[in-house]
Regions:
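Generic structural signal for well-ordered alpha-helical scaffold segments
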Residues: 13-14, 147
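Short, compositionally biased
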Residues: 115-125
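Active-site mouth loops of central-metabolism enzymes
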Residues: 1-6
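Glycine-/charge-enriched secondary-structure boundary and capping motifs
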Residues: 39, 43-54, 70-75, 124-136, ...
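Short loop/turn motifs at secondary-structure junctions
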Residues: 20-22, 117, 154
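Glycine-rich anion-binding loops of enzyme active sites
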Residues: 7-8, 12, 22-115
C-alpha cells in the first residue's frame, strides 16, 4: 500500500504540468469501513513521498470511517492538487506549429491505467514476484523536469499519457487542423508490456489501454531539441 499514494499524487500533478502549472499543494481523502492504522500509514507515506517528488505541500485531508458503506477491507482514496502558472507561460495546443517535434518521455511501467484488464489477466495466469513488482511500480512524476523547460519557454504543449494511450492523449494536445506522425520504432518497450502482449491482447487494445512505455510527451519547436535532451537522463 505504500505506492498507492504516489500514484494518487502523480495522476493529479502530471495533469497540472500539462498546462505548465507548478503544483502548490495537495489534499487527500480516505474513506474506509474500519480504519486500519498500519495500512493507512503506508498509504499516507506514499502521498507524502509523492508530494516531495512533485515539489508541492500536503496541507490537509480527511479520513472517514463509514462501516455502512464500505466493508472492513475496502477503502476509497481520492485527492486533488492546485497549481499556478503565469498566463503567458500556459501550455496550449494553440501554441503548436507545423513541423514541431513530439518527444516521448519514458514511463515507469503501466502507471495508473489499465488495471481492470490486468486484474482480468492475473486471475487466469500465475505471475512471478518480478511481474508483481513491475505491475506495482508507481506512476512517474514529471513535474521537476517539465517545469524547468516551461520556465525557459522551451515547450509549446504537453500530454500526460493515461487512459486512451498515445493517440487519444496526444490528439487533445494539437489543433484539429494538424495531424501527428508517431514513430513507434523509437519507443523502448518495457518487459511488462511485452508480458501483457503475450496474454493475447491485440495491438489496438494495447495502444488504447496502456501507455506502452511512454508516460509523458512534449511538443516542442525543433530548435529546442538539444536543450531539452540535456534536462533528461540519457537512459
Amino acid at each position: 500500500f505504500n505506492t498507492i499514494g504516489i500514484d494518487l499524487v502523480a495522476m493529479c500533478v502530471n495533469d497540472l504540468i500539462v498546462q505548465g502549472a507548478k503544483p502548490l499543494f495537495f489534499l487527500d481523502y480516505l474513506a474506509v469501513g474500519k480504519l486500519d492504522l498500519k495500512k493507512s500509514k503506508k498509504i499516507l507515506s506514499g502521498i507524502i513521498k509523492g508530494c516531495s517528488l512533485s515539489g508541492c505541500s500536503l496541507i490537509g485531508g480527511e479520513t472517514a470511517e463509514m462501516p455502512g458503506i464500505y466493508s472492513k477491507d475496502n477503502f476509497d482514496l481520492a485527492g486533488f492538487s492546485v497549481g499556478i502558472v503565469s498566463r503567458k507561460k500556459i501550455l496550449s495546443k494553440k501554441n503548436v506549429r507545423i513541423n514541431d517535434i513530439v518527444l516521448a518521455i519514458p514511463s515507469n511501467g503501466i502507471h495508473s491505467n489499465g488495471y481492470s484488464l490486468v486484474r482480468a489477466i492475473i486471475k487466469k495466469h500465475q505471475i512471478s514476484k518480478k511481474i508483481k513488482k513491475d505491475l506495482l511500480a508507481p506512476t512517474k512524476i514529471y513535474s521537476r523536469e517539465v517545469l524547468k523547460l516551461v520556465e525557459k519557454n522551451l515547450i509549446n504543449a504537453a500530454a500526460h499519457i493515461t487512459g486512451g494511450g498515445l493517440v487519444e492523449n496526444l490528439l487533445r494536445s494539437i489543433p484539429e487542423e494538424l495531424s501527428l506522425q508517431i514513430d513507434l520504432s523509437k519507443i523502448k518497450i518495457k518487459k511488462i508490456f511485452k508480458w501483457l502482449k503475450k496474454k493475447k491482447i491485440s495491438d489496438e487494445e494495447m495502444m488504447r489501454t496502456f501507455n506502452c512505455g511512454v508516460g509523458f510527451c512534449l511538443i516542442i519547436p525543433p530548435k529546442n531539441l538539444e536543450k531539452i535532451r540535456k534536462v533528461f537522463p540519457k537512459k
